[in-house]
């Protein structure tokens, strides 16, 4: 469970790290080379973040990084938001270190459903027997928000305990899409500057939720993680009030 220890760094920066993690699905995976012992091996990957902050991967057994992790499960995932206007060295980046493990059999169906929801092109790989789902058990997190904004984050905040609302996710999503579409419209307008009366909620996380607008996905962030159904409702009600001026 997230402790959000105040001595690490300010909440604003922690939220920026989480928002970066939630707002992209591409990264560099580093594994320990099986062929060239002692050397790290970098690969481009796509990933999906789960309801909690678990990182999910879908990869082939014949991929070099998969061969590596079967010998040594230690891995590092680096993601970034490139600053193309100014100094690229001032770009935000997040490094997640841990061990890559098979997704448990009981969780495979749900994992596949979520993965295809975010990366529909991955569905074609499901017919190939050598593709499998993995999750990164995160043990170390390094955040760099720019010059002078550097910290090791508390790994306790990135454990894979499921929130209490997890089993109610579909019901909550259907309710928002059917009865509170205006809240989704105003949130998308407020946080991303996009006006779309046909926006729909597609997935929940402890840090916010995802909406789909014109074939693109957008992350709507919260100010703090939410674990209980009643608290999720409170945050959505608060957003509705805060973003009333953004209604279409």
Feature annotation, model-predicted:
Residues 1-11:
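Single conserved hydrophobic/aromatic residue that forms the stacking wall/gate
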Residues 19-35, 45, 75-79:
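A short, Trp-centered hydrophobic/proline-enriched beta-strand micro-motif
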Residues 38-39:
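Intrinsically disordered, low-complexity regions enriched in acidic/Ser/Thr/Pro/Gln residues
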Residues 52-55:
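Short active-site oxyanion
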Residues 62-124, 128-131, 138-140, 217:
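Short, structured beta-strand-loop surface elements
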């Amino acid at each position: 469970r997230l402790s959000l220890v105040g001595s690490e760094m300010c909440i604003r920066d922690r939220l920026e790290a989480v928002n970066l993690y939630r707002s992209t699905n591409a990264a560099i995976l580093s594994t320990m080379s099986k062929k060239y012992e002692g050397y790290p091996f970098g690969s481009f990957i796509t990933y999906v973040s789960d309801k909690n902050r678990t990182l999910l991967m879908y990869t082939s057994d014949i991929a070099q990084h998969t061969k590596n992790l079967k010998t040594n499960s230690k891995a590092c995932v680096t993601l970034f938001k490139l600053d193309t206007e100014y100094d690229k060295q001032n770009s935000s980046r997040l490094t997640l270190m841990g061990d890559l493990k098979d997704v448990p059999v009981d969780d495979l169906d749900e994992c596949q459903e979520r993965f295809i929801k975010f990366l529909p092109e991955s569905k074609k790989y499901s017919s190939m027997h050598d593709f499998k789902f993995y999750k990164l058990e995160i043990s170390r997190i390094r955040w760099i928000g720019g010059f002078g904004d550097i910290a090791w984050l508390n790994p306790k905040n990135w454990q894979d305990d499921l929130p209490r609302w997890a089993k109610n996710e579909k019901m909550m999503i259907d309710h928002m899409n059917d009865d509170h579409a205006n809240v989704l419209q105003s949130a998308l307008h407020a946080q991303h500057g996009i006006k779309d009366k046909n926006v729909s909620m597609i997935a929940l996380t402890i840090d916010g939720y995802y909406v789909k607008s014109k074939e693109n996905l957008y992350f709507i962030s919260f100010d703090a993680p939410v674990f209980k159904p009643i608290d999720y409702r409170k945050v959505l009600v608060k957003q509705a009030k805060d973003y009333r001026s953004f209604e279409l």
